[in-house]
């Protein structure tokens, strides 16, 4: 039986590339993002893709997406909890409170919503269990200047990962985190345009790393994986 994966933020970047590669090797993939059109393009009419438009800030939308996957394919094996945004850079006393709130809503609460919906399904399905992969960042280790919003959320994701890894053990739910340093995506291209670091790697290298984590049996888990552009000068540039 083909395994199933829900990917949030699946319309572009790492999410889209992971979806394409997963379907190419036999995964059934739920594609979740706000914009339907790019999801339809990625799905391209495939029976192994399910287009699930929605916003990660809406818990009901994610619960509905998980329920739709379970109704069609019987279960959810993996959540790639991927959706996220960059906020405008600045010192803490220059940051617009709306940008802080939006960062927390998408990068932290959105991932909480995804994990909550997936955990509930994995806990009750038969056979029980599954895997949650949270997309962190090198910013989960050390920040780049002016990144108080983004860095704060990514440090919080590390706490989410550790707690889910512990709480999931009785139910065969594994949780790990991938911390990616500058895969070439629209988000990173925008960062470069604003004067950020030019050291990047192909987005496919990040997607292959996600699939390595997803492919493991539930008796094994990559708790934390860091994959980064080789020429990044130091980890603090994540």
Where are these regions (language model features)?
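Conserved glycine-rich cofactor-binding loop
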Residues: 11-12
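Substrate-binding pocket helix/loop in short-chain dehydrogenase/reductase
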Residues: 90-92, 99-101
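Active-site helix of classical SDR
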Residues: 115, 153
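Residue(s) in the substrate-gating loop at a strand-loop-helix junction
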Residues: 137
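The beta1-alpha1 cofactor-binding region of Rossmann-like NAD(H)/NADP(H)-dependent oxidoreductases
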Residues: 53-64, 97
